Amino acid sequence: MKYKIEKNTVQETLILPLYSRKLCTELYPNLYRDETAVHLIDQIDYDFSQAEKNSRSLMQRFGALEVAMRQNDLAWEVRAYLKTHPCAAVINLGCGLDNTGRACDNGRCKIYNLDFPDVIALRQQLLPAGEREQNIPCLFRESGHCKLYLCLCARGTIKPKGVLPGPSSVTELPFFSFIEKP
């Protein structure tokens, strides 16, 4: 089954980074590999013709490489942190269809993927949560509520259910945060 992504929707914003990771996997296999991105592209019903046309340009390839290298940098940081904090919670804010948390899983950490409700709905279909992983719909409106909620989740005090409130500006948040489990 293919999952339809409509033009001019929040879900469409998932396409550029996903396609960029797929493109780099094909163009630079010795530098970057993301088989999940390749697999997901095949599961999505979307008109990729413009992305394919643009992928021939040097600027598009450079942009795709930037996306891929950012993923590598984030993964490196997460793995380094997990070496000294193996039971940490990895919080992937604005996760989209990113698989970095799972790719860095050390077998002991917990992974929380947060994004807008419609993005998480698609993610649940394409990348269902693993054993120590949760996909959490989040509205990103109230930062205090978001921080408290994440701390409680990381400590195992509460289990996410429904939609998580969050900060007023997504740009105020890093992609990954770490909360040490007590």
PLM regions and their residue ranges:
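A short SAM/SAH-binding and catalytic strip from SAM-dependent methyltransferases
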Residues: L150-P182
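Rossmann-like AdoMet
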Residues: M1-I91, C95-C138, S143-G144, L152
